[in-house]
Every structure is written in structure tokens, then in C-alpha cells.
Amino acid sequence: AASDVYKRQIEIRLKYMIKKAILPVAGLGTRFLPASKSIPKEMVTVVDRPAIEYVVREAVAAGIEQIILVTHSSKASIENYFDRNFELETTLEQKQKWDLLKEITEILPPQVSVVSVRQPQPLGLGHAVLCAKDIVGDEAFAVLLPDVLVKDQAEKNDLALMIERFNVTQAAQIMVEAVPEHLVDQYGIVDVAAAPAEGQSAAMQGIVEKPAVGTAPSNLSVIGRYAVSYTHLRA
């Protein structure tokens, strides 16, 4: 009986350790027009690869094992990018283009899977996250907004630290970044009793959306990285 209780405790703990990430990519990208008219904004090249690959790499480096794309019918190229293309791989093999072959087969590590779910209507971020509920189930998860690329050269990235904190405390986490005081009216700003040190966390009392300059509770802006469960969302 004691061993059954212990097993149950392990099962519950594993259930609430984050291994899944939701990436909402169904938006039409109107801010990126006219480029996004034919190319999804997430597929716009940054240096030498699509922007969304950097976000997926960030998630994988943080220990994520399943990427859930909440997508739209116009975003098939995103799904295709993370899928295997055996015809292309065979062609590269025949032409002995080994470097290119290695590059495309390593876009997604073998231990990581990508699944897609459609968001039938553009009803916002909360709705996009709910669209993935059947896949996530009762597990905790991360949400990464692909509009934001987080530059992080540390051995353990900020997302990994945030997920680690969630796994220990089971308290919802939101990643923030300090912005100049005169720009607070362009962001969602968190209300905290005291600003946390870099890489640390602090209790949050609320979020003020685009407060007027001079009225913001802090200069810490939300940057599109969350660690939560559907229990938190129901609350």
C-alpha cells in the first residue's frame, strides 16, 4: 500500500512537470504586411533560418519534448518546415550534400515531437491556448509567443529556469523584461512588490495593460513566455 501511494505521488509530480509547450501561430500577422500576405510571419528569415525555429530551439533547450502549434489553414508551411522531407533528404544523399543533409535533419531533435491543432476563429491568446487542451490534458505546460525572440547565451536559458521554478513551486510563472520608463505604455506591465533579480522570481499582484507613462506599477514588461496549467487558467 505504501508503495502504491509513493507511485501515485511520483505520477502526480511527473504530470505537473512541464514537458509540453504551446506556440500560438494562427495570427494573420497584419503588422508584417505586405510580407505576411504570402509568407507566415513566423517563417520570416532571421539571419539564416525562420524566426520560429529560434523559438522552438529555446523550448527544446529548456527541456520541452512536445511542441504544440495552434495554427490556421494559411500556416501549412510552418507544419511542413518541422516535418521530414524524405524526397529532399534522398536527393541530398545522392548528391553527397552531407552538410545540408545534417542541417535539415537536425532542425528538430529526435526526442521532440511537433503536433498541430487548428484555431477555427481568431479569438485571442486565451482561446488559442484552450484549443490545445485536448492534447495537453491535465498536464502543466509552457506557452511561447513566436513574435518574441529571446536572446540567451547562458548554459541554462531563462525559460529553463522559469520551468524549473514552476516544477518546484507549482506557481504560475511569467517571464518579464525591464523596459525604459517612457516605453511602458507599449507593453503589459506587471505589478510586483519588489523587482526580482535577473534569473530570479517574485510574487506578482497583477498586470496592467499599456499603462500611461508615470502611472505604471513597475517597468517590467511581459515578453510572451508563460508556465501554467489549465487549473491556473480556470482560477
Please give the residue ranges for each predicted region.
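Structural motif
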Residues: 20-22, 67-68, 114-115, 140-142, ...
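N-terminal glycine-rich phosphate-binding loop and ensuing alpha1 helix
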Residues: 16-100, 114, 155-157, 161
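Residues marking helix boundaries in flexible regions
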Residues: 11-13
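Catalytic-core segments of class I nucleotidyltransferases/pyrophosphorylases
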Residues: 142, 154-159, 163-167, 194-234
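Conserved beta-loop-beta/alpha segment of the NTase-like Rossmann-fold superfamily
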Residues: 88-90, 103-194
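Short loop/turn motifs at secondary-structure junctions
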Residues: 1, 17, 63-64, 137, ...
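Conserved small/polar residues in nucleotide/adenosyl-binding loops
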Residues: 1-9, 231-235
